């Protein structure tokens, strides 16, 4: 899927100014450039374009509020001065798996005064002698390089991804609200179904009672007939001796 198309889908009926987080991983860039992204995304704080075939960030729009930029697994080899111009408030930058070979390529990042974390995993520059020491000298504002500070202490997850988690929490709250609404609808439907079932049970119960009553009536009638028959037979037996006596006379 092309990047422009992917951005359109990610908007999901929102306006660009409503978007704080945009993930475009694994889509396809045209001619290795960013497309479809404009300065209308003025509230954007997190942008991820992992493995999209980028060779340049020249088309990156002005994103003053962008804090974290994921550019890993692309083919970027230079032109990073654009980042200082277009994303002046970057705090986290991931360039892992790109074609960065020497320190001069990352030197323009000195202008990113708020840059706190830089990742260059799987870039050729990491093979240079005294790589870490030289990068920290070149970019004194850095706290973490490839996930570790100057003393080789690992960056805590909360520091690296805290504000992104905050964005996720907001989205989860929205999802929970939607879920609650859906759940209420389902509950209402279930209540209606239960009421209908209850009414059906009442009707069937009445029918059963009527049938039982009808059957009981038949049994009572039969018993009454039997009683009448026995009485008649008794009367006959009583009359027979009397009749015999009259004959004797």
Swiss-Prot record:
Span list, region Necessary for tumor-suppressive function: 150-174
GO molecular function: histone binding
Record's function text: Multifunctional protein that is involved in the regulation of many processes including tumor suppression, apoptosis, cell cycle progression or transcription. Promotes apoptosis by favouring the activation of caspase-9/CASP9 and allowing apoptosome formation. In addition, plays a role in the modulation of histone acetylation and transcription as part of the INHAT (inhibitor of histone acetyltransferases) complex. Inhibits the histone-acetyltranferase activity of EP300/CREBBP (CREB-binding protein) and EP300/CREBBP-associated factor by histone masking.
GO BP annotations, alphabetical order: nucleocytoplasmic transport; regulation of apoptotic process
Amino acid composition bias (Acidic residues), ranges on this chain: 157-230
PTM info: Phosphorylated on serine residues, at least in part by casein kinase 2/CK2.
Biased composition (Basic and acidic residues): 147-156
Region (Interaction with E4F1): 165-249
Higher taxonomy: Eukaryota, Metazoa, Chordata, Craniata, Vertebrata
Protein's name according to its UniProt entry: Acidic leucine-rich nuclear phosphoprotein 32 family member A
InterPro entries referenced in this protein's UniProt entry, alphabetically: AN32, Leu-rich_rpt, LRR_dom_sf, U2A'_phosphoprotein32A_C
Primary subcellular site in the record, as a coarse category: nucleus
Every LRRCT domain range: 123-161
Modified residues (Phosphoserine): 17, 158, 204
LRR repeats: 18-41, 43-64, 65-87, 89-110
